Amino acid sequence: MPAAASHREQCERNVKAYDTLGGEQAAYFEWPVTTLFYTGVHLAEEYFARLSKPLHSSGHRQRLQCLADRAPEAAMKLAILHNASRLARYDCAFRAFKESDVLRLRDIAAKEIPRALQLDALTM
């Protein structure tokens, strides 16, 4: 099971990937949106690793359920990122995303999920 610091490092790498892909200015929103979801995934895993009895989820469903049991607001925010990622990649809804949508998703990943989990916010 990776340590909390490893999950934080992955979050920071995902932030760099988001920027490299163009962030909210990207020509192809599906990939920056996907990096935001995986940033949220690693925030959840960082939170789990910091628990007095650390745990590591085995998949998206289990992660959302474990999060809902412990931090329902964070689970709701992660579900928003998950749904956006799926819409952008699998439902070909990438055209539906506007810059303002991506900015909102960025705030969820960088500020709202960390706040709900009592973790340090991410700089994006």
Give the label of every model feature segment.
Residues 1-124:
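Terminal alpha-helical segments
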